[in-house]
Amino acid sequence: MATVPNDDGNRGDSRSDRSADCPAILGGTSVRPAGPPGWPLDDERVHAVLRRLIASGDWGRYHGEHVPELSRKLAKYHSVEHVLLCCSGTAAVELALRGVGVSPDDEVLLAGYDFKANFQNVLCLRAIPVLVDVDPETWQLNPERLAAAVTSKTRAIIASHLHGGVVPIREVRQFAEAHGLALIEDACQNPGAMIDGRRAGTWGDVGVLSFGGSKLLTAGRGGAVLTPRSDIAERIKRYVLRGNEAYPLSEMQAAILLPQVEQLDEQNARRRVAVERLCRQRNGIAGLTPLQIPTEDVSPAYYKMGFRYRSEEFSGLSRDLFARSLRAEGVAFDAGFRGLHLIHSKRRFRAVDDLLEASRADAGMLTLHHPVLLESDAAIDEIAFAIHKVRRSASEIVSRIPDGCVTNDAEL
């Protein structure tokens, strides 16, 4: 078991095993030889729901009791009137765009650094993505850059809370209202987060959730659309109801999600405690800065914990080789998303500037996968020790290991 590093990055114990101090990528002993924890967790409440559902035979029904129960539970949890369940978070964003009335040749503003499916959903409606740069400190959508992007064709804004960070959603909402734009709040990575006393996903005309395999609420696949507006809900219903539901969530998926919603707040609180501990343990490590820590006004939900990485503070160790080195130690670090302007033809979008900060996010974003944040204090201390361990040997890693790319957009 690792102990908390001293200020010089060494363990606070008397062990002198050189193999333990040598990075695993160079042949040393891994800090966490069992590797990162899996997801979803082995949860008896989920097992019990599945046993009851299978025993009853209701798991195969088109219209059972669990789907409407989940809709009601999510509506109460988010204090919204309408919740429409669907087959994925990506589908939820598409339905949100359709619900607010986005049409061909309309423009939709979104961050230049965002999940690529949001960009592709805009194209799916034959609308035009307009990329806006991100904030230089948080790498979230920058509301100060919205005004320059608006034209007479602008219809909506997609604001995504990414990697445990949060968009300044109050300011984005005020901008949208002032300009008569629909606001779609993507809370797929931040379910249950609180921002200025309100749940993430409830600040816009529409909010979206994802129940994908690695998400904090998971059914393997699935999503939800949240809205306080009856007109938007009815427009979406007219689109999806075609004699049967075109984007359904199954009874089994809904049943699995019900106990997870009940424990989401408790698990999010545990994740925040773990993040605060990790931030204390990594104190003094320049070049690895958390995107968001809990504050009085913001209680994030850490699907992934994002960091700004600066290789110059790690003896030139690249972001991707750092992630490989931590992976070798059994810690699930990955690169973030790709900048949307870097992976799509310029003919497919409009941008008002060079998206410099989105490019920096593309090159410097690191994410820690969330399952370990529900483990013990000792596990968090092991992560901190692994970071110190790699940093101490960064120059040797650079000289001995060929650099290689860690694929962006990793969805574990």
Where are these regions (language model features)?
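Conserved PLP-binding active-site segment in aminotransferase class I/II-type PLP enzymes
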Residues: 1-91, 95, 99, 177, ...
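PLP-dependent aminotransferase class I/II
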Residues: 69-72, 80-81, 144, 156-160, ...
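Structural detector of well-ordered beta-strand residues that form the stable sheet scaffold
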Residues: 84, 109, 130, 183-184, ...
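Conserved residues at the C-terminal ends of beta-strands
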Residues: 86, 111, 160, 210, ...
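Buried hydrophobic packing segments
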Residues: 92-100, 118, 223, 257
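PLP-dependent aminotransferase-like
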Residues: 102-187, 194
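Glycine-/small-residue-rich active-site loops that bind phosphorylated ligands and cofactors
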Residues: 114, 137-138, 164, 215, ...
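Active-site PLP attachment segment
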Residues: 202-235, 247, 251-256
